[in-house]
Amino acid sequence: MGGGAEPKSRPSRLAFHHRQCLHETETFVSKDSCLTEYYHPGGLDTAFTDPKWGADQAKLAIDQGADVIFGAGGKTGNGALIETAANKGVYCIGVDTDQWETVPEARPCLISSAMKLITPGVFDLISKAKEGNFPSGNYVGEVGLAPFHDFDAQIPAEVKAKIAEIDKGLRDGSISTGYNP
């Protein structure tokens, strides 16, 4: 689920799709997996503020056999997460922050969240400015994965190890997402 199809929402989708398509080489995603995407048709004034639309799209995806919903798009994505939580046996992944804390209604399905670690980025930029080394242009900060919370015991150690390996590879550049802005 995505709040809008504007360029800043595309990198996550493209990177995820790239990794999913490499399933035959080195990932634990099933070869029979399928990626389905829904983007809000409205402009930026509604794309990120429409939880009903997000819930409706999540229900549509679940009715078509989806077993994991990645609910991005602000309140629109939150609607998708909450709808997913109402469906036993379907999982969800949050975005931007640890949505375990911000969307508690999603906890029954919320495995983790892909987080933008804004606080360390702001700290880094302020520190650079204080030192007189404020960078011009775009700043790319840290990202991370939220804790597994209640799902922690259900995530096998080998999956956690593979996630750590992938995280390391993404950070050191040995794994490419396939996305080049």
Q: Where are the regions a protein language model picked out?
A:
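A residue-level marker of the well-folded mature domains of exported/periplasmic proteins
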Residues: 1-181
